[in-house]
Amino acid sequence: MPLLNSVTTPYAEALLQVVNENLQTEEMVSEVKQLLELLNDSPELEKALSSPILETEAKKKIIIEIFSNKVNSSLLNFLKLLADRQRIGILTSILNRFLEIYRENSNIALATVTSAVELTDEQKGLITQKIVNIAGTQKLELVTKIDPSLIGGFVASVGSKVIDASLASQIRKLGLSLSK
């Protein structure tokens, strides 16, 4: 998505610059993650904000109504700016790009761990230690997902690196070796 990045990056960098100046970076990162979760959980809201039928003022009214008590003033003003500039339709992409740039600047690796069952805190800690060694970074943001089809074990991915320690993968490999 290089073309989309060329549109989202300036907005994401501008938001990061504002929060860095106001020393609100950690707070903003938390709010952006919550906002992304909200948008993910309510596709109707995202469709309404993306709709070309709704006027800019109507979109701003929706933004104020829904977010004025949930986000800080910097983020609220940013959302209204995106509505004014007809960019609110790519809000999710802009917020994801903001988080990417934040992680790059803070040297934080993003790891996704998919397991067959919910991981305990101890398991998350052990996996985090292993991934930190592989990724070569001191900080790691861990996103966990559940996929019962793995049967057991986990699959971890950091950037282009994938560690497949799932039982399903081992069974598949065993089946391939037996079929030869």
From Swiss-Prot:
A Pfam entry, by short name: OSCP
Keywords associated with the record: ATP synthesis, CF(1), Hydrogen ion transport, Ion transport, Membrane, Thylakoid, Transport
Gene3D superfamilies with a match to the protein in the record: N-terminal domain of the delta subunit of the F1F0-ATP synthase
Keyword Ion transport: yes
Cellular location(s): Cellular thylakoid membrane
A GO cellular component annotation in the UniProt record: proton-transporting ATP synthase complex
MF annotations from Gene Ontology: proton-transporting ATP synthase activity, rotational mechanism
UniProt membrane topology term: Peripheral membrane protein
Keyword set includes Membrane: yes
Subunit details: F-type ATPases have 2 components, F(1) - the catalytic core - and F(0) - the membrane proton channel. F(1) has five subunits: alpha(3), beta(3), gamma(1), delta(1), epsilon(1). CF(0) has four main subunits: a(1), b(1), b'(1) and c(10-14). The alpha and beta chains form an alternating ring which encloses part of the gamma chain. F(1) is attached to F(0) by a central stalk formed by the gamma and epsilon chains, while a peripheral stalk is formed by the delta, b and b' chains.
NCBIfam families: ATP_synt_delta
HAMAP family (alphabetical): ATP_synth_delta_bact
Function: F(1)F(0) ATP synthase produces ATP from ADP in the presence of a proton or sodium gradient. F-type ATPases consist of two structural domains, F(1) containing the extramembraneous catalytic core and F(0) containing the membrane proton channel, linked together by a central stalk and a peripheral stalk. During catalysis, ATP synthesis in the catalytic domain of F(1) is coupled via a rotary mechanism of the central stalk subunits to proton translocation.
Family: Belongs to the ATPase delta chain family.
Protein name, as recorded: ATP synthase subunit delta
Designated gene of the protein: atpH
